[in-house]
Regions:
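N-terminal capping/linker segments that flank leucine-rich repeat
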Residues: 8-16, 20-149, 222-224, 246-250, ...
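Disordered, charged N-terminal biogenesis/targeting segments of membrane/secreted proteins
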Residues: 1-15, 235, 261, 390
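Structural signature of tandem-repeat unit edges
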Residues: 114-122, 136-149, 161-177, 187-203, ...
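Ankyrin-repeat helical core positions
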Residues: 132, 157-158, 183-184, 210, ...
């Protein structure tokens, strides 16, 4: 059989085998390449996914975010865009979405505005002085900040003179106890969104908005004064603020409201409809220079502990009516200039005006040019000074006054140009009460014993005809 085999078949079979072998190798290489490619893709996808998960995890570690706009206006010089005391906080700072150090110097020619985001890695319990004196802060949004355990917000934005708007709408202030000087000196601040601001736990609001000269709108349902102990100068010098609502449902707390609305020139209405009985311990200067205030009802204020009402309504030139008939003045010692320049006030009910502890009522009605009649003869007045008491009361026609052992009566009836009847039958001293007057009403002087310089200089020339001068003593000049 071997003899029948063609020798030419042998090379052909080997060639076929080699071809098949090469073909198999090529297929194997292609398959290996596909496997490598798939493996590479899987590895890349895994790596990308892991990196993304890492970023997400890092992102989840940021408990708080604050977004703010900063403005730089310099020319060819370096300036610090950010300089905020975050030394006790682990934060990440992003300027225009680029992470950087929290102190950031910037070389700039012209004017620029930068979006800055603060991300905190830890729980916040104190925001005191966080942005204080950051003078290039323009806008702030605290929507993303977690403040559940924050108790102190003192000086948070104090001195931020470029701040125009602040969104505090969604931050939790339930546990905040002190907001002293929170926005003090933000003199360009126009609007604050505090719609969901809760102050039920707050005790200190001293100077909270003081010197916010341009603040015209506070978007807040109400300020809850239930536990507030000190509101001294809270809205002082808020020239453009025209309306505010106060709420209180706790009679026990004693609150300092000295100068609370002092210099609120545009304040027309103080809404106290939901204001329960409130113990007040300081009230002087409370409405001083509130030129636009037309009426006020303080019947819900318990002032039994108050010792001074000095300048309480001074320069309230639009005030037409005031109800103080329910107020307890038993402990008030100082009443000086309380109604000074209330030029539209025509009458006032003083039936409950207890002056048993009063030491001075100087200038009490100074410049009340529309006041026509007043009676103080039922008062228990044992005071040292009534100087300027009715000075400038140009419409005053009838006065009854009872004062014992007073020492200072300077200008008490000065410029009372309409005065017709003056009952001084229980008055024992006039001093220089009419020092520069050229007119004199009908006066009963029977019991007057001390009248040094009552008419100023040239006494004899200035005493009106018909006066009873027989019992007048001590007429030295």
């Amino acid at each position: 059989m071997l003899e029948n085999v063609d020798s030419k078949d042998i090379p052909l079979n080997e060639e076929n085998a080699n071809f098949k072998r090469r073909k198999l190798i090529n297929y194997s290489l292609i398959l290996l390449g596909i496997v490598v490619l798939i493996t590479t893709i899987i590895v890349v996808i895994y790596a990308l996914n892991k990196e993304d998960q890492g970023e997400q995890k890092q992102e989840s570690d940021f408990l708080n975010k604050i977004k703010a706009n900063f403005v730089v206006n310099v020319s060819g010089s370096k300036t610090k865009l950010i300089n905020i005391p975050f030394d006790k906080l682990n934060i990440h700072l992003f300027i225009n979405d680029k992470e950087t150090n929290f102190e950031y110097e910037y070389q700039f020619n012209g004017t620029g505005e930068y979006l800055v985001e603060f991300r905190f890695n830890e729980e916040l319990t104190n925001l005191s002085s966080l942005f204080m004196d950051v003078i290039n802060l323009k806008k702030i949004d605290l929507t993303g900040i977690v403040t559940d355990k924050v108790k102190n917000m003192d000086n948070l934005f104090k001195g931020c003179i470029s701040l125009e708007s602040a969104n505090l709408n969604k931050i939790n202030t339930f546990n905040v106890e002190s907001m002293k000087s929170m926005f003090q000196g933000c003199n360009n601040l126009i609007k604050i969104d505090m719609e969901n601001f809760i102050t039920s736990s707050t005790k200190i609001t001293t100077s909270m908005f003081e010197n916010c000269y341009n603040l015209s709108e506070i978007n807040i349902n109400f300020f809850n004064f239930t536990n507030i102990e000190d509101a001294n100068s809270m809205f002082k010098n808020c020239y453009l603020l025209n309306q505010i609502t106060l709420v209180n449902n706790n009679e026990s707390s004693n609150t300092n409201m000295k100068s609370t609305f002092n210099e609120c020139h545009s304040l027309k209405q103080l809404n106290l409809e939901k204001f329960g009985k409130k113990n007040i311990k300081e009230i002087s200067f409370m409405f001083n220079n509130c030129y636009s205030l037309e009426s006020i009802d303080l019947s819900k204020f318990d002032i039994s502990q108050v010792t001074s009402i000095e300048y309480l309504f001074s320069n309230c030139s639009s005030l037409q009516s005031i109800d103080i008939s329910q107020l307890n003045f038993n402990n008030v010692e100082y009443m000086g200039y309380a109604f000074r320049y209330c030029s539209k006030l025509t009458s006032i009910d003083l039936s409950n005006f207890n002056t048993s502890k009063a030491k001075t009522i100087s200038g009490l009605f100074f410049g009340c040019s529309s006041l026509e009649n007043i009676s103080l003869n039922k008062f228990d007045i044992k005071i040292t000074s009534i100087a300027d008491l009715f000075n400038g009361c140009t419409s005053l026609k009838n006065v009854a006054l009872k004062v014992d052992d007073v020492k200072h009566v300077d200008r008490v009836f000065n410029n009372c140009t309409s005065l017709e009847v003056l009952d001084l039958s229980e008055f024992n001293g006039l001093g220089i009460a009419f020092y520069i007057n050229d007119f004199f009403p009908k006066i009963d002087t029977a019991s007057i014993i001390y009248n040094s310089s009552i008419f100023g200089k040239n006494l004899e020339k200035r005493i009106p005809e018909g006066w009873n001068k027989t019992d007048i003593n001590n007429q030295t000049n």
